[in-house]
Amino acid sequence: ECLDLPEKTYVACSGGPDSMAILDFLIRGKRDVTVAHFNHDTPFGRFAEKFVKSYCEKNDIKLVIGNIQKEKDSKESWEEYWRNERYKFFESLDGPVITAHHLDDVVEWWTFTSFHGNPRLIPYRRNKTIRPFLSTTKDEIWNWVDRKDIPYVTDPGNFDDKFARSYIRNNIIPQALKINPGLRKVIKKKVEKHYEDEERE
């Protein structure tokens, strides 16, 4: 049985392995999904749009595409700029949007925000966005990709350490896991308690 999610929803899909896995999972769960793809107006962004468009056409999946709407503010990092534009697009849609954020993303975000003195978790729900896979590890998602032979594209920016989140993902998290191999379990407990608190509100 699929998760307790709306029967009709958008799925944020970048074309990467995480979002392609979640899209496949929801389609197999007989959900009425429309792919919401955002083009970040980079060479890879244009390539990813072609990939997602081709996949949706081949599999008869509805698709909407969002694009950059304003120039970058000099005070914003590129990561902030792309994220803000992407979420503006999601908020413009006429229904809930499921994203593929997983437990490893939460660990990364918690670490990133800790460096700024305010450790935070990724919420399960905010405005139109639903993140139902926050207790699922990246390895579990990749296992689904391998088992179902799901195609995907890889964003080279994920390996570019000039981006703070990439640097944390590629360098700091591996070292943190050596110090505390149970870090994911610690964060998972925080996530599940946070979800329970959200549901009570």
Predicted regions and their residues:
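Core alpha/beta nucleotide-donor-binding catalytic domains of modification enzymes
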Residues: 1-171
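ATP/NTP-dependent adenylation/nucleotidyl-transfer catalytic domains that generate, transfer
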Residues: 162-201
